[in-house]
């Protein structure tokens, strides 16, 4: 009986420890009450930048973009940014957008990204090449950081000249008309 009571007590303590760890671990998973300790990032404290362009043998072109915290305080981002591409006349280009993840963009769920002042979050914008021909090129990209209502505007033209963000011939169902957007990530790894 003493041995059984000790075993039960150890099991109960272990469950309490696991429950406590679970609240810490959930901070990097889904938004929870733990996220209230770090406020959401405001667009006014973020800047949009870009990293490398990648071209895969599969015909996909992708660009890594960055969101940098220029504020004085630590903040967090969680989820997918809103993205739209515009032509040289300022018109939105009629791409189809997906945030669901496909063969080019990871299907792993979003994770909380905590940004100290000066730190960056990363996201990927990917598009299949134009096989039939080119119609118009993107000049600017507009990004709504996750859970914000103000946009950041960046230059998309450098990626067009190297094969990137073109609207394709072939109509709206052409594979080259689909733009894929990853969730924000803390590192550049697989997005």
Locate each region found by the language model:
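Bacterial N-terminal signal peptides that target proteins for export
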Residues: 2-16
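C-terminal region of N-terminal signal peptides and the immediate post-cleavage residues
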Residues: 22-40
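Low-complexity, acidic Ser/Thr/Pro/Gly-rich terminal tails and inter-domain linkers that flank the onset
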Residues: 34-57
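Short, solvent-exposed loop/turn segments enriched in Ser/Thr/Gly
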Residues: 57-64, 136-138
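Asparagine-centered strand-capping/turn motif at beta-strand->loop junctions
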Residues: 65-72
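The feature marks short-to-medium sequence segments in extracytoplasmic or secretory-pathway proteins
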Residues: 78-116
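Short, surface-exposed ligand- or partner-binding patches at beta-edge/loop junctions that are enriched
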Residues: 129-158
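Acidic, serine/threonine- and proline-rich intrinsically disordered appendage/tail regions
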Residues: 151-191
